[in-house]
Amino acid sequence: MSASAPEPPRLDLSFVRRGGRTVIDRRLFAWPFVLTRSFHTDGARPDLLSVILQTGSGAVHGEDRLTQRFTLREGAAVSVTTQGATSVHRAEPGARAVEQVQLRVAAGASLDYRPEPRILFPDAALCQVLELDCAADAVALVTDAFTMHDPDGQGRLFRELDSTVIVRRPSQEPLLIDRMQLCDPGTALFKGRRAFGSAVLMLPDMHDRAAIRLRVIDTLAHIDDLYAAASLLPQSVGIGIRLAARELRQLRAGFDAVAALVREIDLGARAAQAPSAAATARPTAA
C-alpha cells in the first residue's frame, strides 16, 4: 500500500480549542466506524477531550480497506482509545486487510493515541501504515500492539503482518520510517511471548529527551514479565519504545505506565509555564 495514495478516510475527525476546551469541529465517519459522545473528564486537564472510537463490525476482515484521519489544530488536547481489542480475521490467499491512520498534531497540541491491540487469528493478513505529523512544540504518545489467538488451540498463527510507522515534522521529509514485516512466522520466532507493542513519544525541545528515556526504562522495569526497550529517535526528536510480553495485560500495564509518566511531565511543564492558571472542571459530555 502506498502511503502517498491512501484510500479516502472512512473516519475523519478534526479538533480545535475553543473557550479553554477541545471540541470536535469535523466529524465524518462511515461503516464500520461509530462515534458517539466524547467527554471532558480530566480535572487536571479540563481542556482534554476523550474520544472512544467504536466499530460496528468489531473486527477487521480479509479485504477491508480502512483509512482514519485525526487532525489536532493548534492547542487542542485529545485522548483517543477504542472500545476493545480488535479481531483480525482470516484473509483469502493473496488478499490482506489494509489500514491507514493519519495523525496530524499542530503547534501546542497534545495527543494520547492508544487504541486497543489487534488480535491476529490464524491466516490473518494485515498491512497497516501509521503516519504521525507532529509539530516541534507538540506532545504525542502513539501506541500500536498485537497479539495472536487460535480459537482451536492448535497453535496456528497469522499469515502476514506488514506494519509501517512514519514520523515527520509538518511539511518536511520523514524523520523516521520504521517497518516490520512478518510472513508465515513460526512459533519459535516469538520465544514464548504472544503480545507485542511499540510506542512513539514526541515531546517539545524544552524537555531533556535523553533523561526522559531513562525514566521510561526505569518505569517499565518495574512491570513483571514485560520485556521493554527505549531509544532516542533520529535527531533525538522523540523516544521509540518496544514491548514484548506473554499476555496483553502486561503490555497494557506498560503503555499505561508510559502514559502516566508523560502526563506527569506534561502537567509539570504546563504548571511551570503558567503557575497561576490552574483550573478545575466538572466532567461533562461533549
Curated annotation (Swiss-Prot):
Keywords: Chaperone, Cytoplasm, Nickel insertion. One of its GO terms (molecular function) is nickel cation binding. It is found in: Cytoplasm. HAMAP family: UreD (MF_01384). UreD, UreF and UreG form a complex that acts as a GTP-hydrolysis-dependent molecular chaperone, activating the urease apoprotein by helping to assemble the nickel containing metallocenter of UreC. The UreE protein probably delivers the nickel. The gene is ureD2. InterPro entries: UreD. This is Urease accessory protein UreD 2. PANTHER family: UREASE ACCESSORY PROTEIN D. The lineage of its organism: Bacteria, Pseudomonadati, Pseudomonadota, Alphaproteobacteria, Hyphomicrobiales. GO terms for cellular component: cytoplasm. Pfam families: UreD (PF01774). Required for maturation of urease via the functional incorporation of the urease nickel metallocenter. Belongs to the UreD family. It comes from Bradyrhizobium sp. (strain BTAi1 / ATCC BAA-1182).
